[in-house]
A protein has these predicted regions:
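Basic, Lys/Arg-enriched alpha-helical interface segments
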Residues: 1-72, 83-96
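Catalytic-pocket segment enriched in acidic/His residues
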Residues: 80
């Protein structure tokens, strides 16, 4: 379940508020990003995100240690911290 968002743009997108902040995201990834956030919200366990394999769930390292990501496409990721059975600080980020 999504417990909190890491930025207002991601929160606005998820809640259907197509604000100026949301316009920074490419239009072609919006539906896929929403679908991935719906999967994240439905997850009861981190392992639930291993399917489908296209999510490519991975634990991040370095400055992002403690965070995980799932892929939206080659360039964009949903990044979050999984604690207490939920996703915290959820953000849609350009990973490259």
């Amino acid at each position: 379940m999504i417990e909190s968002f890491g930025d207002r743009a991601t929160e606005d997108l998820y809640h259907g508020r197509f604000s100026a902040r949301v316009k920074r995201f490419p239009k072609e990834i919006l539906s896929a990003a929403l679908r991935k956030m719906d999967m994240l919200n439905a997850a009861c366990f981190l392992e639930d995100l291993k399917a489908p394999p296209g999510n490519k769930l991975e634990a991040l390292r370095g400055d992002m240690k403690g965070f995980h990501s799932i892929r939206v496409n080659v360039r964009w990721r949903i990044v979050f911290e999984w604690r207490g059975g939920g996703a915290h600080d959820v953000s849609l980020v350009d990973y490259h």
